[in-house]
Amino acid sequence: METRKYTKTRRAEQQDETRARIVEATVTLHETLGPAQTSISAIAAAAGVQRLTVYRHFPDDASLFEACTTRYLELHPPPQRVAWADIEHPSERSYAALLAFYQYYRQTESMWRAAYRDLDQVAALQVPMDRFEAYLDEVADDLGLAWRTTQAARRLLKLTLRHALRFTTWQSLKNAKLKDRQIAELVQSWLEGVES
């Protein structure tokens, strides 16, 4: 009986290890080639398994992308609100949040660039990307509430923050040769302009 229990335990461990290798291979290929250019054959080769093994663990693109996104965000978690929650002045709080996201984007640029580039081509990307965008909107709305201003100005502040927190906004300003602090300062001036 002990041998059978050991065999089942070892088999489960091997399946977990295989699954982890497939996920790691997917993360690496999505970051280097992009989701649209990553084939199941390439994932299988990088993970050292057969294509059928990939399908056994991940029967559809949605489950594979969910596992890939979960793993990537475990390794590279986006900035969390607790990092700037104690900053009282709304302009300084917004600046701290923006700078945190811009530094995060710089460190993780290759993955976000590939994901946004391939978003329209890969349906399975939509759910994880929508979830990330929803998180950005929550952060923007939370930052906007800290500003003591009129309702109309607050609406514009939130819209500005939502736009400013997007990877694509950071990317366009980075491509214009601005550093992260310069981008955060520029956006801070937009916010202060809306408030006045």
Where are each of the predicted segments found?
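Residues in the recognition helix of alpha-helical DNA-binding motifs
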Residues: 57-58, 67, 186
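Basic, helix-initiating cap at the start of DNA-binding domains
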Residues: 1-33, 37-52, 57, 63
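Hydrophobic alpha-helical connector segments
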Residues: 67, 78-107
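Short, basic, alpha-helical segments at the C-terminal edge of helix-turn-helix-like DNA-binding modules
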Residues: 40, 69-77
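Short helix-capping/turn signature of helix-turn-helix
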Residues: 58, 117-121, 164
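Amphipathic alpha-helical packing segments from all-alpha helical-bundle domains
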Residues: 99, 103-116, 121-159, 184-192
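Amphipathic C-terminal alpha-helical segment
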Residues: 142, 158-179, 192-196
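Alpha-helical DNA-contacting segments of helix-turn-helix folds
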Residues: 30, 65-72, 119, 128
